[in-house]
Amino acid sequence: MHCSTADLPAVFEAPQGMWRMTEWEGMNIEYMSFQQEVDPGPLLHGLPDSLCSCPHWGYVIQGQVRITFADHEEIYNAGDVCYIAPGHRPAFGANTEFVAFSLAESYRPVMEVVSKNLAALQQTEV
């Protein structure tokens, strides 16, 4: 099973970047590409402590990913493979491409909150 990142369904597309995602065989696959710095933290409001409760495994293709935890911060750069523990808030640097994998069962409740917040945000921008 495989596909091009361009063929993944879009969650978000805007001039500052895109976020594509699908679910295969119990795994969630995400591809993100951002031309500008992006802080998706506001999309996490409604989750405990406004932090993502799902673990992720990822690879930074280019750019930088900053992950903030309650007690520390981790920075991943191009070429880094990473494990992101639950209880985090991500931020993406300009010109960043990132691929992440998550257990779909753990990610679904997070995406329910994120989807509601994204829809509300998009309505205020209209």
What are these regions (language model features)?
Residues 1-41, 48, 115, 120-126:
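A short, N-terminal "cap"/entry segment at the start of jelly-roll beta-barrel domains
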Residues 25, 68-72, 93-95:
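Short strand-coil-strand connectors
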Residues 41-43, 77-79, 109-113:
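A short, polar/proline- and glycine-enriched secondary-structure boundary/capping micro-motif
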Residues 69-88:
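Short acidic-glycine-tyrosine-enriched beta hairpin
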